């Protein structure tokens, strides 16, 4: 590998693909008779990644196998094997339903909507976002916390179908074969077990409104959002073949599950129950529909979600893998940012272990990793553009603990020293 160097125009090397000189690129790789720059290598990798996606959706008459879907999910999501299998099978069956409906009409295959339950930061939303990358059907994500009953301030449930239409460029036929992910579904649980004279417009009312579109109905969707344009023409969208995936953290559900089956008594003969010391993800494995009813979901809504997948808590090992292994791993992202300043960013193994421990202490799962790294690298990213001689930045465990500054390695290796910025 040859780096840019030398000012003699006769000895200047050029990339054989894009024509840039060795002075215009970071690195130039030499072959027997040709050269290729780092930018062209990146472009080639992007092309290969796109082709691998297209080969996925063309296998077996356009129906990707569960293993193929799982393989792509593994590239971005660490752990959660059970949830990946459930999603892979569900999406595979969704494709098969669509193919079957187009060829046969003797047996009607019903869809199986999915409910994902897992602690915060366990990867529910990331799984859905990763599915969106690999599917050849329209995909949209909605937030249940913004939904209200029709006629109240907030979004109507029909807006979910509108987003799916927008994702399909208003092609109704394609939208009717799409997949919808509704996040924060636990936030629309019934606010109380007892009926109330006041309407629960963002809880049970939204569940009631979602029932029809999840089961299958012809929804009238205003293409511009109905409330501000009441006179517009409505589009008719059949939701029968739209797959719905719902996800939520369901905070407090673990207590309902743990309490199930434990007899309660008072007085001298009462049985003292030991506290359940299992992790939240372990408790979620034993969830039953009756637990969801006690949590606040109405029976009809639970019945529309026959497939249930639970996600595990992420332990220290999994969080370290999340930092380093996926294609969009946080460490790789920050290393790329530093490469733009011609600086190599290195994390010591003990430092990554401490970052994972901090995320566990905060109980934010993988979602908390970015904020931890941002706080660690803030001063360095602020100072780096003005430091021309720095070639490498090393993050050790003391930096994560806030007891030291990152180690700056300058172009002159004899100048290895901590950052010159004062505390």
Curated annotation (Swiss-Prot):
Keywords: ATP-binding, Chaperone, Metal-binding, Nucleotide-binding, Zinc. PANTHER family: ATP-DEPENDENT CLP PROTEASE ATP-BINDING SUBUNIT CLPX-LIKE, MITOCHONDRIAL (PTHR48102:SF7), ATP-DEPENDENT CLP PROTEASE ATP-BINDING SUBUNIT CLPX-LIKE, MITOCHONDRIAL-RELATED (PTHR48102). One of its GO terms (molecular function) is ATP binding. GO terms for cellular component: HslUV protease complex. Residues 3-56 form the ClpX-type ZB domain. Zn(2+) binds at residues 15, 18, 37, 40. It holds the Pfam family zf-C4_ClpX. Coiled coil: none annotated. InterPro entries: AAA+_ATPase, ATP-dep_Clp_protease_ClpX, ATPase_AAA_core, Clp_ATPase_C, Clp_protease_ATP-bd_su_ClpX, ClpX_bact, P-loop_NTPase, Znf_CppX_C4. The keyword Zinc applies. Belongs to the ClpX chaperone family. Signal peptide: none annotated. GO terms for biological process: cell division; proteolysis involved in protein catabolic process. It comes from Methylobacterium nodulans (strain LMG 21967 / CNCM I-2342 / ORS 2060). This is ATP-dependent Clp protease ATP-binding subunit ClpX. ATP binds at residues 119-126. Gene3D superfamilies: 1.10.8.60, ClpX chaperone, C4-type zinc finger domain (6.20.220.10), P-loop containing nucleotide triphosphate hydrolases (3.40.50.300). Component of the ClpX-ClpP complex. Forms a hexameric ring that, in the presence of ATP, binds to fourteen ClpP subunits assembled into a disk-like structure with a central cavity, resembling the structure of eukaryotic proteasomes. ATP-dependent specificity component of the Clp protease. It directs the protease to specific substrates. Can perform chaperone functions in the absence of ClpP.
